[in-house]
A protein has these predicted regions:
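Bacterial Sec-dependent N-terminal signal peptides
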Residues: 1-27
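Short N-terminal segments immediately surrounding and downstream of signal-peptide cleavage
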Residues: 21-43
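A short, N-terminal "cap"/entry segment at the start of jelly-roll beta-barrel domains
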Residues: 36-104, 115
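Conserved short histidine dyad/triad with adjacent acidic residue
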Residues: 104-119, 140-143
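Short, conserved beta-strand element in jelly-roll/cupin
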Residues: 123-135
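A short beta-strand-loop-beta hairpin characteristic of the jelly-roll/cupin
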Residues: 135-170
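Conserved metal-binding segment of the jelly-roll/cupin
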Residues: 169-187
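Conserved small/polar residues in nucleotide/adenosyl-binding loops
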Residues: 194-201
Length: 201
C-alpha cells in the first residue's frame, strides 16, 4: 500500500524494558518518568501541531529529555508540521530554516519484512509520521540482536529474532520517534500478520 509520510532526520546528540526483552533506553527515575508523562499529556511540546500524538511505543522520558536539551529544534519541527498541508505537500527533502533538521516527504510502498533492514543511529533521531495509508514498524530486542554490519555515519544494521520483535501499525493520529536506543525497522507490509510478544506477559 502506498502511503504518504513525513520523516525527520534530527541532528540531536544524544532500554522500553519489557519482561520479554529490552527495546529502548530504560529509566529508573520514577519522578522523571512521572514528569515526562505529565509533560507529554499536557501538549506543551505541540507548538501548533494538532494532527497527532506520540504512539504508545515512544519513549516519553527520552522525548521529554531530548526536547529539553534542544527545545528550539523541536519547536521548529512541530511548527513546520503545523504550517504545511501534509496531505498535498510535494515529495522531496526540506531543510527547516534555522535548524539542523531535514524533513523527507515520501510517497512509496512498503516491503516484506525479509526485504527490510533493521537500523539504529548513534546521533540522529527518527521522527516518522504517516499521514496517509499505513506503515508497519518493528522495534527489535537488544538482548537477542547483534550488529551485522560496520557502523557508517550515521547508521548500523542488526540481525534480530522476528519472534522477539514488537510490531506496530501506523495511524494518521499517531507519530513515531526512534531514539538512538530504539533499534527499528520501517516500511514493512501490513498485509501479513506478525505476532509480537506482549509487553505485559
Amino acid at each position: 500500500m502506498k502511503r504518504q509520510f513525513v520523516f525527520f532526520a534530527m541532528m540531536i546528540f544524544a532500554v522500553m524494558v519489557f519482561a520479554q526483552g529490552v527495546y529502548t533506553k530504560p529509566c529508573t527515575d520514577k519522578a522523571l518518568e512521572k514528569k515526562a508523562v505529565k509533560w507529554v499529556n499536557s501538549g506543551k511540546w505541540r507548538n501548533g501541531f494538532k494532527m497527532a500524538t506520540p504512539h504508545e511505543s515512544v519513549n516519553v522520558v527520552e522525548f521529554y529529555t531530548q526536547y529539553k536539551k534542544n527545545p528550539e529544534q523541536w519547536k521548529a519541527m512541530f511548527k513546520w508540521l503545523s504550517t504545511r498541508d501534509l496531505l498535498t505537500i510535494e515529495k522531496g527533502k526540506y531543510t527547516i530554516e534555522g535548524t539542523k533538521l531535514i524533513a523527507s516527504v515520501e510517497d512509496s510502498e512498503n516491503g516484506d519484512l525479509s526485504e527490510r533492514k533493521s537500523e539504529s543511529h548513534y546521533k540522529h533521531i527518527d521522527f516518522q509520521f504517516v499521514v496517509k495509508g499505513t506503515e508497519r514498524f518493528g522495534i527489535i530486542d537488544h538482548e537477542t540482536s547483534k550488529p551485522n554490519s560496520q557502523y557508517r555515519p550515521d547508521v548500523i544494521h542488526y540481525e534480530y529474532d522476528n519472534n522477539k520483535t514488537l510490531f506496530y501499525d501506523s495511524t494518521p493520529d499517531k507519530f513515531f520517534i526512534f531514539f538512538p536506543d530504539d533499534w527499528h525497522i520501517a516500511k514493512i507490509n501490513t498485509c501479513l500478520l506478525y505476532t509480537s510478544p506482549s509487553p505485559r506477559d
